[in-house]
């Protein structure tokens, strides 16, 4: 299923409930989802108390005229045979190409990165304010004014240093509840290799260790998660 909105099946819900009970998925510091219904429902089962941030660009691929069809439906279609021979790189009729979809998912990765950076910056700022406020309350009034002025002048530089240190020293658990196609596209971007190397079963996924280097993510490790 691609762009068609469809709720989880009863069997799918049971699979996710089993996964939620296992000690595999850690509570995320930040939770991203595809805005499509099946991902919203999946996230609600796996992380019921966690706020989810939808990434519009992480919707499933648009399969166009092939939406909802399987091999038996298409095996006598000449263009479908060409699509298979192209390793799935030809665009779907009335839909997306693999490359278009990868680029869309990459835009979503940039959007998610911005949310991550903003959340870290807020945490750093809150920590700095609390620390500075505690120090200032112990000063006399004239000294407070000087301290407050100095604090404002130094705030941006200190926050940037603290943000860099916080990012490096405190790894965070970030979870994305998305589609199989989205997983393949993102891992193709991050790890290279063939787009179809990263296929997973329903309810499956990958655990990745990533580092943000400038504006690019670097992949340190990759492990498949299965139910």
What are these model-predicted stretches?
Residues 33-34, 103, 177-178:
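Short beta-strand scaffold positions
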Residues 29, 170-180:
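Generic beta-sheet signal
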């Amino acid at each position: 299923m691609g762009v068609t909105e469809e709720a989880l099946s009863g069997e799918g819900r049971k699979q996710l409930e089993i996964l939620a009970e296992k000690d595999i998925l850690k509570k995320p510091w930040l939770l991203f989802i595809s805005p499509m219904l099946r991902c919203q429902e999946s996230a609600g089962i796996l992380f019921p108390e966690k706020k989810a941030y939808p990434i519009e660009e992480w919707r499933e691929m648009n399969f166009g005229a092939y939406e909802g069809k399987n091999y038996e439906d298409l095996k006598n279609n000449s263009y479908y045979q060409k699509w298979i021979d192209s390793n799935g790189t030809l665009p779907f009729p009335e839909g997306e190409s693999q490359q278009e979809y990868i680029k869309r998912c990459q835009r979503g990765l940039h959007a998610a990165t911005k949310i991550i950076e903003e959340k870290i910056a807020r945490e750093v700022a809150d920590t700095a304010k609390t620390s500075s406020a505690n120090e200032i309350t112990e000063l006399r009034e004239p000294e407070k004014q000087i301290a407050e002025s100095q604090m404002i002048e130094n705030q941006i530089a200190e926050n940037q240093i603290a943000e860099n240190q916080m990012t490096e020293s405190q790894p965070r658990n970030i979870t994305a509840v998305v589609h199989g196609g989205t997983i393949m596209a993102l891992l193709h971007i991050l790890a290279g290799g063939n787009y179809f190397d990263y296929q997973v079963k329903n309810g499956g996924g990958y655990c990745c260790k990533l580092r943000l280097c400038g504006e690019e993510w670097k992949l340190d490790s990759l492990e498949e998660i299965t139910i």
